[in-house]
Amino acid sequence: MSISARNQLKGKVVGLKKGVITAEVVLEIAGGNKITSIISLDSVEELGVKEGAELTAVIKSTDVMILA
């Protein structure tokens, strides 16, 4: 699949917490850094997300939130 987003980070799923509707996915990227995303449980199932899976996070610059 071809996408236009330039902010793509490859990594490994090191955490997965499933809720009733959504899931929290933790991806370890280069340098041991981690990013966390909340996605729908349907997406987790459709994409086959599981701990240890190699995935690519696609990040739109307009959808980034910074927490302190």
UniProtKB/Swiss-Prot annotation:
All copies of domain Mop, residue ranges: 2-68
Q: Which PROSITE patterns match?
A: MOP
Recorded hits in InterPro entries, A to Z, give: Mo/tungstate-bd_C_term_dom, Mop_domain, Transp-assoc_OB_typ1
Show the Pfam families listed in the entry. TOBE
Q: Which GO terms describe its biological process?
A: molybdate ion transport
Q: Which SUPFAM superfamilies match?
A: MOP-like
Q: Which UniProt keywords apply?
A: Molybdenum
Its function, per the record, reads:
Binds one mole of molybdenum per mole of protein and contains a pterin.
**Protein name in the entry:** Molybdenum-pterin-binding protein 1
